[in-house]
From Swiss-Prot:
Cellular component aspect of the GO annotation: mitochondrial matrix
Coiled coil: none
Organism in which the protein naturally occurs: Candida dubliniensis (strain CD36 / ATCC MYA-646 / CBS 7987 / NCPF 3949 / NRRL Y-17841)
Principal location: mitochondrion
Protein name (database record): Amino-acid acetyltransferase, mitochondrial
Catalytic function, reaction form: L-glutamate + acetyl-CoA = N-acetyl-L-glutamate + CoA + H(+)
Pfam families: NAT
CDD domains registered for this protein in UniProt: DUF619-NAGS-FABP
Record flagged with keyword Ribosomal protein: no
Pathway of action: Amino-acid biosynthesis; L-arginine biosynthesis; N(2)-acetyl-L-ornithine from L-glutamate: step 1/4
Taxonomy, superkingdom: Eukaryota
Record GO terms (molecular function): L-glutamate N-acetyltransferase activity
Length: 580
């Protein structure tokens, strides 16, 4: 009878454990779907991180019966990590392939790394508690964090005093982030002297000293102490050099299926890179391939104090160096840079924490192409950075011939076949090529090509009542890139910067993109009997609008809105459709 009671208690306990596990998995999936705004974002996240979760694991109700064979266990994340640790400890190569009993090669479950460089000043205990919760959430979402401590603010003349200070701060940080003996807390370990420096270049002595804690679910915290091989002594190294050294070691000493660096995060009290356009608040998104030199120049025009400017310049340069290196070595642009404040990292709401939100969606909390002058666009202290895509812009300022499509084709600046294929693919229709090119050939205002024809925009000059008005004739993104973050914003931002004074475009009334357009325009209109919705924007609408038509002539500082809308309607309704 007692044996039956024991089995009954065990069965009830297993049911309760199963319910807790199932609820946790359900809540995780629901939170992912809630935080991602499109089905494609949710799918992209789950495709990348699905192996980090054991969604298909069933509770083993009978622990005396082994229902999983070796092949099944080696497809499991935790089993693979245990195998890698044993290989490390046995001094064998952990990066070699994994096979089952039938010598079938198994896919490895990679570590998805996020490297955090934390500036250890002005972080309150309350913020540390929030930061700890953010790390827990990131781990739940499949991220393996690595923390690097930034002590660059310390004087460089006393190693001993600095070392004592760092030990004290490191111990405090261990307490802030959690104690390993407590089940629900983070597991963290403090590491030092992992690097040897030769001629100022740090190299990682032992990759396993970082990977083993990660495989055990422990967050390594790296102190910026290195062994100087030239001077035979320990010393501090600038955190930015250490960040590049760590990224280099992780990229160069690994196989592509073992780990990936997903995020490079700088936690700095000063926040993201300031933008003049956004009234000194942060750039929302930076496409380094296109914007790096311009933003660097902007920082030096005197709108911020030199000591603050130097910090932002240093952060931007470091991000550019690290992301460019990773891009070159890995051959992809999957690594994202994030610069934000301790206060913002401590926010524990997925949609408001830019780090968590970026893990889920790979984009910023708001769109970078939203107009910064409107009250409905929030101002942020976070900058999202990508190595990004190359951008080609052709307009009258950078082309010394007559700006026609035929000249751009003849000079091989624009590939006609690729452009037409992009337009056909983007719109899902066949372009009526000759009539279309004949219509726009002599009216080109700007042509934008992004990447290898991943996206494009064609802006033409259209005429009404003796005035020429910029018209967004084509805005195309390849189907494989539609719904992906950043690309549409990059193109549309260039469009607005190219024609800031006045721009119009049209879209079919049933186009699902119209909501996106509406958020980026000054206004829109549509006639009941028309198939088109007409959008307009530009600095011209910063002027006073003469709604009562008391000024028949267009005076300086006043815009006759009735006349403008008539012009826009005449242009947009008069252009023949381009597709068959």
């Amino acid at each position: 009878m007692s044996k039956l009671k024991t089995l009954n208690r065990q069965f009830i306990s297993n049911l309760e454990t199963h319910k807790v596990t199932t609820d946790a998995k359900r809540n995780l999936i629901l939170s992912i779907l809630k935080s991602t705004t499109t089905k494609r974002e949710a799918k992209n996240y789950l495709t990348k991180y699905q192996n980090q979760f054991d969604f298909n694991d069933d509770l083993d109700f009978n622990k005396n019966i082994k229902i999983k064979n070796e092949q099944l266990s080696l497809t499991n994340r935790d089993s693979q990590r245990e195998l890698f640790i044993n290989r490390f400890l046995n001094q064998s190569n952990p990066f070699i392939n994994i096979y089952d009993r039938e010598d079938v090669k198994l896919q490895k479950v990679p570590l998805r790394l996020a490297i955090f460089k934390i500036k250890f000043t002005k972080i309150t205990i309350k913020q540390w508690k929030g930061i700890a919760e953010t790390f827990k959430r990131l781990i739940t979402l499949g991220i393996s964090p690595i923390i690097m401590l930034d002590y660059d603010h310390l004087p460089s003349n006393s190693f001993k005093n600095n070392e004592l200070y760092m030990i004290n701060q490191g111990n405090k940080m261990l307490n802030y982030l959690g104690r390993p003996e407590e089940e629900s807390d983070l597991k963290v370990t403090l590491l030092r002297s992992l690097f040897t420096s030769h001629k100022g270049v740090p190299t990682l002595d032992s990759l396993e000293s970082i990977l083993i804690p990660l495989y055990q679910g422990i967050i390594p915290i790296i102190q910026p102490i290195v062994y100087n091989a030239d001077a035979s002594k320990q010393e501090f190294l600038e955190s930015d050099k250490l960040l590049l050294g760590l990224s280099s070691a992780l990229i160069e000493k690994r196989t592509t299926d073992l780990l990936s660096i997903e995020k490079i995060v700088m936690i700095d009290p000063m926040g993201g890179i300031p933008s003049i356009e956004r009234r000194q608040t942060s750039h929302v998104f930076i496409n380094l391939s296109q914007e790096y030199s311009d933003i660097l120049s902007e920082l030096f025009i005197g709108h911020i104090e030199p000591k603050y400017r130097d910090t932002h310049v240093n952060n931007l340069n470091t991000m550019n160096n690290v992301l460019s290196f990773i891009n070159e070595k890995s051959g992809n642009d999957e690594t994202t840079g994030i610069i934000t404040t301790p206060e913002i990292m401590s926010i524990n709401i997925d949609q408001l924490n830019p780090i968590i939100y970026n893990v889920l969606t790979d984009r910023a909390i708001i769109s970078s192409s939203l107009p910064s002058t409107t009250n409905r666009t929030p101002h942020l202290s976070t900058t999202i950075i990508k190595k990004g895509v190359d951008v080609q812009i052709f307009d009258i300022d950078n082309y010394d011939k007559d700006l026609t499509m035929q000249n751009l084709f003849d000079d091989k600046l624009v590939n006609k076949e690729k452009l037409i294929n992009l337009l056909n693919d983007s719109f899902g229709k066949s372009l009526d090529v000759d009539p279309y090119l004949d219509r726009i050939n002599d009216n080109i205002a700007t042509v934008v090509i992004v990447g290898d024809y991943d996206g494009a925009a064609i802006i033409t000059w259209e005429y009404s009542k003796g005035e020429k008005i910029a018209y967004l004739d084509k805005f195309a993104i390849a189907k494989k890139n539609q719904g992906l973050p950043g690309l549409a914003d990059v193109i549309f931002k260039i469009i607005l910067q190219s024609h800031p004074f006045e721009l119009i475009w049209r879209s079919r009334k049933n186009n699902p993109v119209n909501k996106w357009y509406f958020e980026r325009c000054c206004g829109c209109m549509s006639a009941p009997d028309s198939q088109w919705k007409i959008f307009y924007t530009g600095e011209v609408f910063d002027k006073k609008i003469d709604r009562f038509k008391r000024n028949p002539r267009h005076k300086n500082g006043v815009v006759n809105i009735d006349r403008k809308l008539q012009q826009y309607s005449e242009i947009c309704e008069g252009i023949t459709p381009s597709f068959k």
